[in-house]
Amino acid sequence: MRAIRMLLVSALALGTVTAYAGEQDVQRLTQLLEKSQTIEANFSQLTLGADGTSLQETSGKMTVKRPGLFYWHTDAPQEQVVVSDGKNVTLWDPDLEQATIKKLDVRLNQTPALLLSGDVSKISQSFDIASKEQGEVMDFTLKPKTKDTLFDSLRVSFRKGLINDMQLIDSVGQRTNILFNGVKANQAVPDSKFTFDIPKGADVIKE
C-alpha cells in the first residue's frame, strides 16, 4: 500500500508524436486538470520493483473534487480507505481497525493526488514539465524541482481530455502504474462523500 500512500499523502502505438516544451506544457496540463472539477473512476494498480518484478496488484474506486477533496477505496484483500476533506487526510485500515489522521499537505510535490483535485495554478513552481502528444493521448512528465519529495518523477496521461493513467517512480527505481477506467467527469458529488465516520472502538492515531 506504500504506493497509494505516496500518491495520496501524491506495445507502442502507431501515429504521429508531437513534443512540446516550456510554458506551453504548463498551460496544456493546467487546462486539462482544471477542466474536470470532479472525477469518478475505477482504478487498477501495479507496483514493479526496479528489476521489473511485480510486487503488488490492487484495484478499487476513487472520487475527487476540487478543491482538495478525494476518496480512494482499495478493494480487499488489501482493503484501505483514504479520504481528504480538504483539511485533513484519514487513512482507514479495516484489518487493523485503525484510523490515521494527518493534516493535508497541499504541496503538489508531496501529495500528487492533488493534481486531480487541488489548486494547480502554480504547478510550474513545483515541477519541471514536459509533454508528448500521440494521437488522442497526451502524456506529461513531471519532475520535482526539489529533492524533499516522495518520488523522482510522475507521468500523467490523458485520453480524449480525461485522465487515463499515472506512473510514479521513486528514488530506488520502484514503479507504480495506476490505470483508470470508467472515468466520469464533472458529475454532481456531495461533499459528504469526503467525510469518513470512524467506527466505534477503532484505534485512532493523529500525526
UniProtKB/Swiss-Prot annotation:
SUPFAM superfamilies in alphabetical order: Prokaryotic lipoproteins and lipoprotein localization factors
GO annotation terms (biological process): lipoprotein localization to outer membrane; lipoprotein transport
CDD domains listed in its UniProt record: LolA
UniProt key word Protein transport: yes
Keyword field contains Chaperone: yes
Domain of life: Bacteria
Keywords associated with the record: Chaperone, Periplasm, Protein transport, Signal, Transport
Subcellular locations according to the entry: Periplasm
Residues in the signal sequence: 1-21
GO CC, one annotated term: outer membrane-bounded periplasmic space
Its job: Participates in the translocation of lipoproteins from the inner membrane to the outer membrane. Only forms a complex with a lipoprotein if the residue after the N-terminal Cys is not an aspartate (The Asp acts as a targeting signal to indicate that the lipoprotein should stay in the inner membrane).
Subunit structure: Monomer.
NCBIfam families: lolA
Family classification: Belongs to the LolA family.
Protein name per Swiss-Prot or TrEMBL: Outer-membrane lipoprotein carrier protein
